[in-house]
Amino acid sequence: MILYPNCKINLGLRVVRKREDGYHDLETIFVPIYGLHDELEVVPADTFSFEQEGIKVDCNPEDNLIIKCYSKFAKKYNLNSLISIRFKKNIPFGAGLGGGSSDAAHMAIALNELFELGLSKAQLAEEVKELGADCPFFIYNVPCYAEGIGDKLTPIDLDLKGTRILMIKPEEGVSTREAYSGITITGEGLGDLGKPGILGNLNKFTNDFEKTVFPLHPIIGEIKKRLLDAGAYYASMSGSGSTVFGFFKNNPEGSTDAKLRVLKEEFASMVLLDDTFGEWKA
């Protein structure tokens, strides 16, 4: 079977508190982006194999989240066959898009179907939580209000159908450690903003990491400014960066489109996606 692990963006991201275990409690809105995805093919086989192409995954095979997920399921559920995995990496690293977490979650979905494990989405989400804080979100893969370390999820009604999204990522990435290095914790979450009807309050959805990341990587802040100048009604860095996205009213005959063409030409090598939201894939 073939799956297409997609990425996500964050609408707002508040760092609420540092926990005793060293992690941080967050509040954010996760939004799936189906148009930018990796490719994952998993089939039963007599011998185990893993073939990877696309963007180079710079880690030992045993540290790859796809392999970790398979190892976890093979041991816990005594899977009765080995598998062959073909994987193409398209979602960049250090981008704030959750690509690795999505790969692990979709691997779990594949194993659940291939081996007829009968696990519910809630059970799958619990299984993948230890692989990455964002992993449970990709099991549901619809807009969610996220709390805790990103693992406490509440699906929300978010209508972005017809909205145009432009995603730009500079060559430089941002490590999670770097993003947290100078963060100021205010203790303020999203509050009522995280509830249905958020589109009218989008400009209040700020990303706390921007205050840390923009001074260290001025190009990221410049991209956000340029998106707004080009007519985006909302723009933000996603997660801990370095991807920045802008929402536009889909008006191809208007002046916004002319400004967007200029912007896309200037940042041509950095554009990850220019797409329009459709229906959510529940």
Please report, for each region that a protein language model flagged, where it lies by residue.
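ATP-binding N-lobe of GHMP and related small-molecule kinases
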Residues: 1-95, 113, 117-122, 157-161, ...
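Residue-level signal for inorganic ion chemistry
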Residues: 11, 40, 66, 100, ...
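Glycine/serine-rich anion-binding loops at beta->alpha junctions
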Residues: 86-115, 133, 233-248
